């Protein structure tokens, strides 16, 4: 499973990139809205200067025709921009049109296996099932990853699964076990993955022994 960082904060992206494990970035309107110091397009240019992998940039339009035009504008910013489209009927139309133009797409706000299957059939490069938000309403978001992976494998679909709305390290472990191709998460979760109390204790013991 590859690691994406879910943020529009350039400092966080650079820090994640320095770890040597960053394969891409996902953003959304909520994350971009937190970045008051720069325009959306300028921030995307900054991000694509740092990251060579996929950078998902979400449209804010809701009508298919407007999504398509906005998607073309976003894709023109850099060759590694992936246009992020919400899972709606208009979104599916936009995905098909953008795919036909050779533009990569990431269908977001996936909460059912049927939604993921529709997005894949429309030509989506990626689908993003949301784990944490399903957990919040008493459903098991990780089961959705398993369902989508099985369906894609059975039908030979190339669309990749991005496990999104990752809240903690256990989400990462389980998403990887269940076959997600990518996990996108905040920098704080990536940092949590590096930690274990026995690792810290081992380092302390090594240093104590060395300094005797």
Curated annotation (Swiss-Prot):
Pfam families, sorted: TAL_FSA
Please provide the Gene Ontology terms (biological process) for this protein. Answer: carbohydrate metabolic process; pentose-phosphate shunt
Q: Which residues form the active site?
A: 84 (schiff-base intermediate with substrate)
Q: Which compartments does it reside in? A: Cytoplasm
CDD domains of this UniProt entry?
Transaldolase_FSA (cd00956)
Catalyzes what? Answer: D-sedoheptulose 7-phosphate + D-glyceraldehyde 3-phosphate = D-erythrose 4-phosphate + beta-D-fructose 6-phosphate
Q: Which Gene3D superfamilies match?
A: Aldolase class I
Q: Which SUPFAM superfamilies does this chain map to?
A: Aldolase
One GO cellular component assignment for this chain's record is: cytoplasm
What EC identifiers does the entry list? 2.2.1.2
Entry keyword annotation includes Zinc: no
Q: Which GO terms describe its molecular function?
A: aldehyde-lyase activity; transaldolase activity
* Record's keyword annotation contains Transferase: yes
Q: Which family does it belong to?
A: Belongs to the transaldolase family. Type 3B subfamily.
Per its UniProt record, what HAMAP family does this chain match?
Transaldolase_3b
Indicate what this protein is called per its UniProt record: Probable transaldolase
């Amino acid at each position: 499973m590859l690691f994406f960082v879910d943020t529009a904060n350039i400092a966080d992206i650079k820090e994640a990139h320095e770890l040597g494990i960053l394969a891409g970035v996902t953003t959304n309107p909520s994350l971009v809205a937190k970045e008051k110091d720069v325009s959306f397009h300028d921030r995307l240019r900054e991000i694509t200067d740092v990251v060579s992998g996929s950078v998902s940039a979400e449209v804010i339009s809701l009508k298919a025709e407007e999504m398509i035009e906005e998607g073309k504008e976003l894709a023109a910013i850099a060759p590694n921009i992936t246009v992020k489209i919400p899972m709606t009927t208009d979104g599916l139309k936009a995905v098909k049109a953008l795919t036909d133009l050779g533009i990569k797409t990431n269908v977001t706000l996936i909460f059912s296996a049927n939604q993921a299957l529709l997005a894949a059939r429309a030509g989506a490069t990626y689908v993003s099932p949301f784990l944490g938000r399903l957990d919040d309403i008493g459903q098991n978001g990780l089961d959705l990853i398993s369902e989508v992976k099985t369906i894609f494998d059975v039908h030979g679909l190339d669309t990749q699964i991005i496990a999104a709305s990752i809240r903690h390290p256990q989400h990462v472990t389980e998403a990887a076990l269940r076959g997600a191709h990518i996990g996108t998460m905040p920098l704080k979760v990536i940092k949590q993955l590096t930690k274990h109390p026995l690792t810290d204790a081992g380092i302390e013991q090594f240093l104590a022994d060395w300094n005797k």
